[in-house]
């Protein structure tokens, strides 16, 4: 997950209200993202799922 301050055209900007980028993946397979996108609050990781969040509203 790249946290971007400057936005090239192909990076997406999160909508208002969901200004954190995040990536979710299984703890067993950290190289394979399950889901990525924008969220309002960074979820807590569990034993099965791990979340990585950016504090910027621009992500790839």
Swiss-Prot record:
Question: Is the keyword Hydrolase in the record?
Answer: no
Keywords, comma-separated and alphabetical? Cardiotoxin, Cytolysis, Disulfide bond, Membrane, Secreted, Target cell membrane, Target membrane, Toxin
Provide the disulphide bond pattern: 3-21, 14-38, 42-53, 54-59
| An annotated GO cellular component | other organism cell membrane
**Localisation per UniProt entry:** Secreted; Target cell membrane
GO MF terms held by the record:
toxin activity
SUPFAM superfamilies linked to this entry: Snake toxin-like
Could you state one GO biological process linked to this protein? killing of cells of another organism
- Which InterPro entries does this entry report, sorted A to Z? Cytotoxin_Cobra, Snake_3FTx, Snake_toxin-like_sf, Snake_toxin_con_site, Toxin_cobra-type
Q: Is Disulfide bond one of the keywords?
A: yes
Chief location of this protein within or outside the cell: secreted
Entry comment describing in which tissues the protein is expressed: Expressed by the venom gland.
Summarize subunit and interaction data from the UniProt record for this chain.
Monomer in solution; Homodimer and oligomer in the presence of negatively charged lipids forming a pore with a size ranging between 20 and 30 Angstroms.
The similarity annotation says:
Belongs to the three-finger toxin family. Short-chain subfamily. Type IA cytotoxin sub-subfamily.
State the function annotated in the UniProt record. Answer: Shows cytolytic activity on many different cells by forming pore in lipid membranes. In vivo, increases heart rate or kills the animal by cardiac arrest. In addition, it binds to heparin with high affinity, interacts with Kv channel-interacting protein 1 (KCNIP1) in a calcium-independent manner, and binds to integrin alpha-V/beta-3 (ITGAV/ITGB3) with moderate affinity.
Protein name per UniProt: Cytotoxin 2
